[in-house]
């Protein structure tokens, strides 16, 4: 049966254009009992053990690729997470040497407790085995897996970070065939104030960036590797773990005007060019309600919702009905010993951008296996070119507010889908769109594009000293004339702003071609951002393919002229929510200076 499907798929793939292939429906090959419910691989409207199904077709589109036998073979993915049950019956065949347990300094990566479940779920999304008669399957079911329990409490040292991200104790990236080409990082932080991206103040930032750059550009004979990073889960409810307020949740009135409490550019490592950041969409083909968004999002992938009223992601779980996600109180019809999973080895409740990132990592492994000669830069170009415009009619988000003159005004804080001057479509929710594995592999197999020489420019400092009017659309503006000729991959800025309410600020970067990128949305959860921004870094992919030469414009707009009420939930049983007020700034802010650098090609 499988041989016949594969032969047919090869004939079809050889005979049709990419557009023709995209318009043909292919079945997902059978062989795993849960695969029919894995909507993220093939969405037919199935409920995935929740109350209802989603919208058919909103998925990773892997059917033809899997039918052709392109499933990640020869590519190893690293799971940087908590423990991973590598001896799980659906993971063991893809386990490769190289995993490390930092807690006991051994290669035994078994979860240290029944609740250490996150890493096993992530690993299964990437590369749980196919056609073995159990469970479901991964996006890249023949890729290799290694893991590092860096996220376990007590393991988060710089040395451990470097090892888990591919840099060994001798200071060099390991050069070997089984060295990972894909690193999955399903982790991040939620911040209550903007942070500085300053190498002198935080030397570890340079250590991390230098390591990721070296591994990305030099490993595997120069073909390199790719780091995938989850965008975060802070759109509608901000979770604080390091706040002066203590541990808890934050909500603003009126659902924060429909705007995200956490912008992806507030997390410093999400502003690194070397991290390919993924947001999450649900089974209806819309942004997952929790997904953090922003201009450094590269692509989007399935993360689902919560697996109760609507689907989450089905993947491997720590084995046993008393471990992993199975014992959680949130109801899901798979959990607790379903006939298709009597030993409780799987979960239908994995979600978050923690699930979206490994979907992207698995897709990258498949793309690399389709054409092992592809470089890291080629793979990024393939994703930017072939990702699907999801939620195509989304209007963006307009913020209506009363300005300092008492007039009701509107600011377009998140644009609808935009096409830049190079023809690439981009949305701050979805980046270049939803990853389409079949389309990406179709391009990858015969890829012959010469992208040119990769270039990273030096930062250029621009002095501004421009006043930011309180609660007024006029904002502050500063320009920089760039004389370097290169094709843009991404643009990175750092800003220095004096302001006592950074939550109010929208920051825009406008290219010489007129493309506008909102690199910081207003009304973020930076309620403790009373000291402005010092070297706060932001990244934008919105200008991909455009020419860098010409005048770049930075605008900063203050979008509030009044105080705002919010609620703080201390997350402690029995303690009541606290009603609080965020005070508006009493003086105009100042855009002091900013710097800019380009990542691109000549």
Language-model regions: role of each:
Residues 232, 401, 405-508, 571-602:
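Secreted peptidase-domain scaffold signal
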Residues 371-426, 562-565:
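An often Trp-containing, charged/polar helix-loop segment at the C-terminal end
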Residues 1-22:
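Gram-negative bacterial Sec-dependent N-terminal signal peptides
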Residues 71-73, 129-133, 148-272, 340-358:
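Substrate-binding/access-modulating region of protease and related hydrolase catalytic domains
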Residues 24-37, 63-99, 104-161, 176-182, ...:
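Subtilisin-like serine protease catalytic core
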Residues 34-78, 104-115, 167, 209-217, ...:
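N-terminal domain-start motif of subtilase-like serine proteases
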Residues 81, 254-365, 369:
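Extracellular S/T/G-rich loop segment that most often corresponds to the catalytic His/Ser-adjacent loop
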Residues 555-562:
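Short beta-strand-plus-loop segments that form exposed binding edges in beta-rich domains
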């Amino acid at each position: 049966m499988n041989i016949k499907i594969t032969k047919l798929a090869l004939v079809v793939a050889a005979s049709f254009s990419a557009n023709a292939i995209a318009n043909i429906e292919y079945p997902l090959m059978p062989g795993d009992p849960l695969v029919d419910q894995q909507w993220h691989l093939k969405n037919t409207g199935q409920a995935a053990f929740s109350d209802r199904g989603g919208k058919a077709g909103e998925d990773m589109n892997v059917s033809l690729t899997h039918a052709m036998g392109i499933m990640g073979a020869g590519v190893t993915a690293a799971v940087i997470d908590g423990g991973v049950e590598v001896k799980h019956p659906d993971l063991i065949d893809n386990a490769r040497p190289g995993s490390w347990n930092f807690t006991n300094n051994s290669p035994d990566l078994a979860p240290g407790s029944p609740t250490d479940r996150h890493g096993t779920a992530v690993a299964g999304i990437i590369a749980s085995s196919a056609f073995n008669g159990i469970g479901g399957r991964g996006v890249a079911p023949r890729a290799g897996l290694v893991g590092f329990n860096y996220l376990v409490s007590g393991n988060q040292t710089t040395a451990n970070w470097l090892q888990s991200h591919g840099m060994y104790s001798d200071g060099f990236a390991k050069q070997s065939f089984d060295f990972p080409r894909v690193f999955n990082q399903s982790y991040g932080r939620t911040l209550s104030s903007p942070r500085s991206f300053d190498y002198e103040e935080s030397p570890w930032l340079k250590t991390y960036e230098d390591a990721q750059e070296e591994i990305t550009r030099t490993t595997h004979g120069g073909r390199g590797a790719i780091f995938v990073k989850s965008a975060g889960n802070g759109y509608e409810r901000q979770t604080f773990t390091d706040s002066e307020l203590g541990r808890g949740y934050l909500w603003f009135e009126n659902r924060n005007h429909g705007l995200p409490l956490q912008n992806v550019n507030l997390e410093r490592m999400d502003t690194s060019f070397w991290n390919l950041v993924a947001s999450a969409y649900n089974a209806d083909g819309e942004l997952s309600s929790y997904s953090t968004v922003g201009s450094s999002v590269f692509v989007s992938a399935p993360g689902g919702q919560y697996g109760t009223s609507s689907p989450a992601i089905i993947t491997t779980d720590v084995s046993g009905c008393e471990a992993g996600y199975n014992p959680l109180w949130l109801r899901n019809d798979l959990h607790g010993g379903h006939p298709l999973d009597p030993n409780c080895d799987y979960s239908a409740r994995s979600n978050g951008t923690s699930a979206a990132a490994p979907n992207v990592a698995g897709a990258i492994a498949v793309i690399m296996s389709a054409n092992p000669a592809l470089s890291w830069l080629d793979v990024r170009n393939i994703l930017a070119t072939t990702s699907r415009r999801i939620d195509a009619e989304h209007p963006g988000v307009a913020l209506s507010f009363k300005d300092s003159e008492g007039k009701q005004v509107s600011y377009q804080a998140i644009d609808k889908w935009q096409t830049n001057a190079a023809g690439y479509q981009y949305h701050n929710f979805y980046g270049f769109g939803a990853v389409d594995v079949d389309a990406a592999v179709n391009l990858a197999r015969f890829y012959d594009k010469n992208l040119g020489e990769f270039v990273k420019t030096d930062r250029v400092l621009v002095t501004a000293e421009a006043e930011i009017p309180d609660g007024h659309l006029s904002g502050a503006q500063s320009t920089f004339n760039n004389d370097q000729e290169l094709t843009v991959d991404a643009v990175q800025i750092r800003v220095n702003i004096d302001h006592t309410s950074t939550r109010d600020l929208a920051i825009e970067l406008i290219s010489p071609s007129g493309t506008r990128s909102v690199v910081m949305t207003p009304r973020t959860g930076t309620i403790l951002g009373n000291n402005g921004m010092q070297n706060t870094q932001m990244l934008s992919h919105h200008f991909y393919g455009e020419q860098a030469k010409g005048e770049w414009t930075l605008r900063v707009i203050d979008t509030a002229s009044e105080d705002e009420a919010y609620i703080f939930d201390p997350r402690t049983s029995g303690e009541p929510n606290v009603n609080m007020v965020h005070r508006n700034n009493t003086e105009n802010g100042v855009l002091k200076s900013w710097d800019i650098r380009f990542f691109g090609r000549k």
